[in-house]
Amino acid sequence: MKRCDRLIDVGRRQFLAGAAVAAAGAAATALPARSAGAGPSPALVDYPSIKLANLTDLQVDQPFDVAYPDGDSPGVLLKLGRAVDGGVGPDADIVAFSTLCPHKGFPLHYVADDKSLDCPGHYSRFDCEKQGMQIWGQATQNLPQFRLRVDDAGDIYAEGVDELIYGRLNNVLAG
């Protein structure tokens, strides 16, 4: 068998496709890598400190509707009845989350039986006892949790958000 009989005839389309992939790879390696400390995360900005409720307003497994960091961002304040990571208050059992599903922005509802926030749109579920960790569904990130503080009078303040709220480029909107 002749050596040239083993060669494969690459058509024009295959050649151009291969050249395009090679050019894209060369361009990607020529771009400077983005530094990890290049700028603040969209979720790590200056947040307002807003009073959400008082300890006396909350009952175990009864969601308390709130809005943070502004009126266009619905959330829920929950007293879970047992201490959890990220919980505040005398029993470390109070947490707050955005109620916009990070997948498509559907409004979430609280299910007391398993202490989860569930999405009716595409069935994502988030564990309120595990800092809003996704436990099921289409979402690709955990639920944004509000950073809380309780003062000596029992007032509960939200002072930040740990993830980007659905539909926003920045959690704190320009006034």
Predicted feature residues:
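N-terminal pre-ligand scaffold of iron-sulfur
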Residues: R34-D114, P144, R149-G175
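C-terminal segment of classical bacterial N-terminal signal peptides
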Residues: T29-P32
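Iron-sulfur (Fe-S) cluster-binding segments and ferredoxin-like electron-carrier domains
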Residues: L108-D113, R125-G132
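Short cysteine/histidine-rich metal-coordination sites, predominantly Zn2+-binding motifs
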Residues: K115-Y123, M133-L143
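Solvent-exposed alpha-helix faces
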Residues: A20-V21, F106, S124
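N-terminal secretory signal peptides and thylakoid transit peptides that target proteins
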Residues: M1-A23
